[in-house]
Amino acid sequence: MLRARPEALMLLGALLTGSLGPSGNQDALSLPWEVQRYDGWFNNLRHHERGAVGCRLQRRVPANYADGVYQALEEPQLPNPRRLSNAATRGIAGLPSLHNRTVLGVFFGYHVLSDVVSVETPGCPAEFLNIRIPPGDPVFDPDQRGDVVLPFQRSRWDPETGRSPSNPRDLANQVTGWLDGSAIYGSSHSWSDALRSFSGGQLASGPDPAFPRDSQNPLLMWAAPDPATGQNGPRGLYAFGAERGNREPFLQALGLLWFRYHNLWAQRLARQHPDWEDEELFQHARKRVIATYQNIAVYEWLPSFLQKTLPEYTGYRPFLDPSISPEFVVASEQFFSTMVPPGVYMRNASCHFRKVLNKGFQSSQALRVCNNYWIRENPNLNSTQEVNELLLGMASQISELEDNIVVEDLRDYWPGPGKFSRTDYVASSIQRGRDMGLPSYSQALLAFGLDIPRNWSDLNPNVDPQVLEATAALYNQDLSQLELLLGGLLESHGDPGPLFSAIVLDQFVRLRDGDRYWFENTRNGLFSKKEIEDIRNTTLRDVLVAVINIDPSALQPNVFVWHKGAPCPQPKQLTTDGLPQCAPLTVLDFFEGSSPGFAITIIALCCLPLVSLLLSGVVAYFRGREHKKLQKKLKESVKKEAAKDGVPAMEWPGPKERSSPIIIQLLSDRCLQVLNRHLTVLRVVQLQPLQQVNLILSNNRGCRTLLLKIPKEYDLVLLFSSEEERGAFVQQLWDFCVRWALGLHVAEMSEKELFRKAVTKQQRERILEIFFRHLFAQVLDINQADAGTLPLDSSQKVREALTCELSRAEFAESLGLKPQDMFVESMFSLADKDGNGYLSFREFLDILVVFMKGSPEDKSRLMFTMYDLDENGFLSKDEFFTMMRSFIEISNNCLSKAQLAEVVESMFRESGFQDKEELTWEDFHFMLRDHDSELRFTQLCVKGGGGGGNGIRDIFKQNISCRVSFITRTPGERSHPQGLGPPAPEAPELGGPGLKKRFGKKAAVPTPRLYTEALQEKMQRGFLAQKLQQYKRFVENYRRHIVCVAIFSAICVGVFADRAYYYGFASPPSDIAQTTLVGIILSRGTAASVSFMFSYILLTMCRNLITFLRETFLNRYVPFDAAVDFHRWIAMAAVVLAILHSAGHAVNVYIFSVSPLSLLACIFPNVFVNDGSKLPQKFYWWFFQTVPGMTGVLLLLVLAIMYVFASHHFRRRSFRGFWLTHHLYILLYALLIIHGSYALIQLPTFHIYFLVPAIIYGGDKLVSLSRKKVEISVVKAELLPSGVTYLQFQRPQGFEYKSGQWVRIACLALGTTEYHPFTLTSAPHEDTLSLHIRAVGPWTTRLREIYSSPKGNGCAGYPKLYLDGPFGEGHQEWHKFEVSVLVGGGIGVTPFASILKDLVFKSSLGSQMLCKKIYFIWVTRTQRQFEWLADIIQEVEENDHQDLVSVHIYVTQLAEKFDLRTTMLYICERHFQKVLNRSLFTGLRSITHFGRPPFEPFFNSLQEVHPQVRKIGVFSCGPPGMTKNVEKACQLVNRQDRAHFMHHYENF
């Protein structure tokens, strides 16, 4: 084998180590030797890692773990550590060392140990071997609680170990495993740099050159709190190379000694070599100090410690492993602990042992060890002289006897971990041995080739037998279970026992012979032989003399041993007597003083929505103040008007309702009128002569309330500002009653009783509703159970309410008509038999019975009597004209006066009464009977039929011929297959020439008829049945929504469960789950769900994407129209999860605030470093001084603002405020990104969810910005019934669209960026565009208010619009079919309005169209929903000369709700439609059906009517339930080999 030259090896080592200088530069190349690395690497050129920082301990004996891998042995396998400590190591202090070893040697041993090994640093993830304290322990459990546990965290281990029995856990050494002065210079290059001054080769000093500077953050010095005083922080701790060099002032003194010795050598070298630079001076001084340290430790201190010398040094042995063994750590530390005295003397060079200052400025003869752990700014060590005195005192003081006894300063008052200020050093060392997996005492003896004692008494004859008995009892007399630590202590007396001596000797031999940089190794080029000899002759006494600068005679030659006759003997062997008492155990409360602040912070965060609510209230207030200024003049005029003839007051409408300001006027003719503050009449009460009026006054709570009870009316409850104002009104009312001969009865009662006695409008309406149900149940033969039951309350209030009668206005309102309509006047006058101006329920019932159950003679006689205005028994032509005009008024005035006169003449002429001026009842009945017979059966128009009525000039005939071809079955008809009824021989033939037939002619050839009879659904009676039906309809209508919400929710639950399970049970060990399981599961799970929700909520606002997708097949599965609702749902779910996320972190913050720093350093290794200070950060640090905390608070604030301002109530008050605050979403996402970027618990993951939706949303926004938007002037605006606003505006040049398409508009008065989609109701041929907008939301409601009246003259007064579109729909394909069926549900009719007008226009021009027939079916719950469409359908009917359009209207709300207006529609419609061939209420020729459309029979009959048509298009728009029924009917009909029905639908 080739041997390398030493120079080559040196160069190779320098290159490999990289330690060529302070920063690896070329400066060190000028040095004649290879500079040793600070971290221990590359000492051994074959095994580079040996002795390096972080290298694992090397076992000399196999591990002894409970599972053979890493689990430590605990109770009950082994005894309790505290019991063992008390039994084996408790004893009397004050016994001197058998060989007069000095205290300086003890602490020098600790210093040497800190140079080669450090395993005290807690490991991560945190594992605990807590020490259970026996109940009643005098130190740790004086109160006998029995639940005291001293925490013990297992040490840091090599992560590559602990995986199998062949690779058990090994602890990692946190310093270099070489005797290389790392306790002086640190164990890393950066640590050494932090200690250096980089000037003159010296270590950096503080203000006093004899002291190093204070500990700084880069050094990471261990800064445990002072257990005696609780003082903490780095202030007062010196910067040393040893992490725990400040544990005791005795270790500090040795650290200061070597600090000063290095600087002394640097100064000496600088004087000798003035041309050397800092690096050369430092490395030469360092080299010399390390060599001196090695020499003293191995050749001076170790022999005095072991009473043995090492073999002669024979040279470097590269194949010898010098790694520190765990057995050495325990053997050395425990033997040192037996020698530590309870106190330490201080003396000067003249042998004067001085007094020391203690807490409270009391003096004692020595420093008490237990009160000087981690002490800051020790008053006894403020100067160099005092440090020198401490070193001299330790050199003269004899240590404790080397036996099994450990003084109480270590056994009971060692610095404690966690919240405990004290712990048991021996018990902790026993746990440390178990943590290391140390073998038993017997196994170690075998491994080192030593004899095993046969029994307990053979251990050591010098040990107290009681100690052996107590120890043996704890081990159950099993000597094989005796642990290494206690066995080594028990075998020692005066000197380390055989086992400890063998372990220590073996370790130092390997340290010396395996170190390539050992000072005696002449091959490393460090020293010459002369320098080596000089170093060998240097002792610690020489170091002390050089540093302290004293006479050598003040010290014995060997400072580690004091021999008789040596200078300065100690006054006496120190005992605990005369020394201060050890500061007792204290248990820290990390959360002390933080509870109020934490509670206030949580409350403040919870109040963020309230703050936002207050802010929204301020905004609403200022907005309302501007509005009030505009109405100030109006209010003043109202007040003046009210002051003249009215009394202001507040009306109480009922419980849980807000009182409103009103004005009461007592008018002439016994009239009491109620107005609002705008002088709009709210209520008029007409009193009758001699009518009794009851007045009830409140007699408490300020006497401001009165109750006015008027017969046949609901009560009026008034609240006045003061009793005086109420008295003034009572006086006016009294004068009013006296003037008009009215009776007034006055009573008093409490205000609460007055409110309870009042019959409010709502109460009356509820009672009347049930009464109407019973009335119609009798008339319409409805089951009484369906009608409901009367309340069982028989109180006076109910009896009074049941006696009330309907006024003329209430009667008109019940019919849905105007009070001034002639029909209302006529019917009311007829029904009011007693002429008292009110309509009783019996009178109302009589008129209903005639309408519904009367014979044709009864009905005609009733009509005859209604319009026989002069009551002469004859109906004149003028009275007949009045009757017809009343019908026309109800029918929206669809015929002019001239046309009506012509109709009357035609009817007289057709009936043969053209020569009569008056009709008897018989004549009138004959006229109606004849028309009723003709209108009951009407022949269906055949395919392509048109031109009907062209030859008829009579208007009435034309109306008959153009009537929508609906065929209703007679009561006697039976249903036939496919919905086709039997032929009707008396039905006239319509279509072509058949339209010209006179009334009364019979059809010779029957034709197929459409089945259009409405399906009456029976109302479910039982509560459960109603709920089930409600649930079924809900699922039917929202099945797509439910599926999408279920899928989205499943994803959210999935990501929640994934993250919660991962961080709770499957994540890499980090202690966070063990520390705060509930908090981490809640916070991590909700964080993932919130990230997903807040990311994908952006897709619900991608309008252009949604517009595109709505036209694809995906619309069948995804309800794109519900994007805004889905947006709200996601937002609400996200904010709930965000609150839970915050609650989870509130739990986390509390737990982190009460967790020791050692645990937090494991959980957050990138944030915290365990420096022993224990104290965690306060709660406010987590909330306000961290990026996640501060951004989290800001996120809560932003969410509070956005959610409060987005509430429905505030949007109605200030939509602009909602729109502006909602743009905070940009800040929201910025904070979300920053919030997770800190990687406190996990790496940022928000971008994983956010990236794709953000790109899509950004692209969608760019499309919106690039789209052309045209400013349009509104030509006409009209407010239609049912809350519908009609807007007609200019058609931009080049604006092309198809019927059925929709646009997006923005009103400039409501904001230029807010667009809403609406379907065009104008036809493509029209010059203007029109929209019918129903007020269902805040924007559409405000739009209706804005266009209620123009601000200027003409169209210029209307706000302009922005127009965006048009956009396509599936309904524009209607023209591709010969026959199309349009089915609209509710407001879903709007797409078809444009289609109908477009169809009629094209047909009137004679355009060639494939479409020959349109059937328009509209399904609506109540006639209120189609009032606004009457004009459009009427226009279509008037222009439809070819009979292309057939209109069906189905009202589904009848027996199920018993709406009075709908029920009256049913009655009047069936009776009066036969008179004028128009619907009584809509004015349309189409028949209004009551029930649900029979789609399947209708489609079957449609095949019979159009047999030549092979494809029929069906287009439906409305709620999902309706479109589903249409789809189902199409599927059933398509099973037949006949016409194919192609269904296209849109849901809203």
UniProtKB/Swiss-Prot annotation:
Q: Where is this region: Peroxidase-like?
A: 30-596
Q: Which InterPro entries match?
A: DUOX_peroxidase (IPR034821), EF-hand-dom_pair (IPR011992), EF_Hand_1_Ca_BS (IPR018247), EF_hand_dom (IPR002048), FAD-bd_8 (IPR013112), FAD-bd_FR_type (IPR017927), Fe3_Rdtase_TM_dom (IPR013130), Fe_red_NAD-bd_6 (IPR013121)
A cellular component term (GO) from this record? endoplasmic reticulum
One Pfam family this sequence matches:
EF-hand_8
Q: Which residues bind Ca(2+) 1?
A: 832, 834, 836, 838, 843
List, alphabetically, the Gene3D superfamilies matched: EF-hand, Haem peroxidase domain superfamily, animal type, Nucleotide-binding domain of ferredoxin-NADP reductase (FNR) module, Translation factors
Q: Where do the record's region annotations for Interaction with TXNDC11 lie?
A: 960-1245
- What is its biological role? Generates hydrogen peroxide which is required for the activity of thyroid peroxidase/TPO and lactoperoxidase/LPO. Plays a role in thyroid hormones synthesis and lactoperoxidase-mediated antimicrobial defense at the surface of mucosa. May have its own peroxidase activity through its N-terminal peroxidase-like domain.
Question: How is this protein named in the record?
Answer: Dual oxidase 2
Gene field: DUOX2
